[in-house]
Amino acid sequence: MGTIIYAVGWTQHSFGTQIIRTAAILQLLLGNVGRAGGGVNALRGHSNIQGATDMAGVFDILPGYLKVPIPTDVDFKTYLERTTPKTVKPAEWDSFNYWSNTPKFAVSLLKAMYGPAATKENDWAFNYLPKVDRNYSWVNIWNDMYEGKVKGIFAFGMNGVMIGPDSQKNIDALKKADWLVVCEIYPDETSEFWKAPGITAEELKKINTTVYRLPGAGFAEKDGTFVNSARWLQWKNVALPPPGRAKVDQEILATIFLKVRELYRKEGGKFPDPILNAWFPYTDPKNPALSELAKEINGKALADLTDPKTNQTIKAGQQLPGFAWLKDDGTTLGGNWLYCGSWTEAGAMIQRRGTEDPSGLGIYPNWAWSWPANRRVMYNRASCDLDGKPWDPERRQVWWDEAKQTWVGNDVPDFKADSPPKDHMGPFIMNQEGLGRLFVWLNDGPFPEHYEPIENPIPNPLHPDRSHNPVVKKYKTPLDKYGTPEQGFNVICTTYRLTEHYHYWTKNNPMNVQLVPEPFVEVPYELAQSMGLQGGEKVKVTSARSHYIAKAMVTRRIRPMKIDGKEMFQIGIPIHWGFRGIAEDADKTAKTLVNQLTPTVIDPNAFTPEFKGFLVKIEKA
């Protein structure tokens, strides 16, 4: 048994999805999917990346990974026909196809969003949802702002200038915006973009962007939840109150929403209905309690419900115990079907802190709550053979109980509970055919292929005439330039994070600054020798887009590489420093941004920028 653990070293490429698909295929072939200690698992750079994605913090999904409406979805029926997969039963296999329940999940979500305004007669208010007509991923939004198509942006806990890629392009985009709203706990490069090095006094006079800065609360200054990569939904308690005039997120967002709705009521608008009819049934509308929000996301009954199999009844107004209770007739609401069961009539499952692990498999079933259904290992039916017996009898997860005619185990079975092994139901219940897939529907082909980064020092050895991903998105503004070895860019550069710093935040914290006080460029010993470079000397790193200046840290950690018979060097630069922070404000850095070096190139599936491999030249500063 073995797991594959990855982080942004795999994802931040123009072919990142291809790399992860390769890992998934390998684990399927090895039988390591659905088994404790197996799978393909992501290490996240933030503590709640999983939760943000679950709740649709990206443009192309709704909460619970429901598909977003598109312009051709003229009504709810059309939307469901497009997004609800048809069950496929290959050969002798049966299929559960749990996404066939999409209508129940979608209607319950619309009821949570619009309450009484969502009725069968008006298609459950489906047409209140915006229709996504193009790619609104992060890089595209900033590119549109640069081109003058986006007039303003809300940046909540997001330092857009630093995040990149091509920070200079992001700075220039903000110069063209009409307005910018930043909610942060420190002044940062985005909220003070006009202070970027290189902006002249004359240019400053021409920047007409109105900037609003809202004092937010840090993660320790508010209640809330984190969802880790194992899908554990865990409640956290406030450690200390926000200082001064700082406010928690829900109070800030509710204040803005209520004011916008008030303006729509007074002044009308092109299509005010979604704003005017948004359901906001909270005890304190100006500062909704997170417990109320969590209960709404879990879901509740809007009418008395009865399970025909067990005769169990749930009264109107009661919390739902699980997503099997969700209906498509308007009698239930739920903000995210995957979280249904997290806050029930029995209480807040997400606040549990039981440390017992009777199976010894690291399941910890009573610690917080894991979606879906408190299941700790997804697709755990695959841990058994065709007869329902565990492949590893000493590490049993689930199994078929012939006497009880049901699946039982140390974990919640991820399967149709009463489907006996003889029915040959496929274990991968979220796929319409119930099987694991070696071929998938990706934008760049059904099977992984090796591609080089957009900026690469050699041709692709497999197919030199097509070195990089053929469907990768390359931008064509005047700032979008790409380097080649022929132009003198013959050193590979990568970016990374440090253990001692947390993205672009802790450079404002004296303790972290004491640990690593200033930026550096990590240079291989052999490259430094060839340059006559000593550790501590300043270097200038230049890409086709901009330059970066910092002290060199000469190391043997990054080794020279032999590529196509040639010795090639790679350097590394941590991402954390910019032109605002303790060291920057004390003029102890050059105030350059590492993402001024990186190209605006994104993976065609996940739309992740290519930070991990690009070309530069390096010289003494």
Predicted regions and their residues:
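Extended redox/cofactor-interaction regions of prokaryotic respiratory oxidoreductases
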Residues: 28-210, 215-223, 311-529
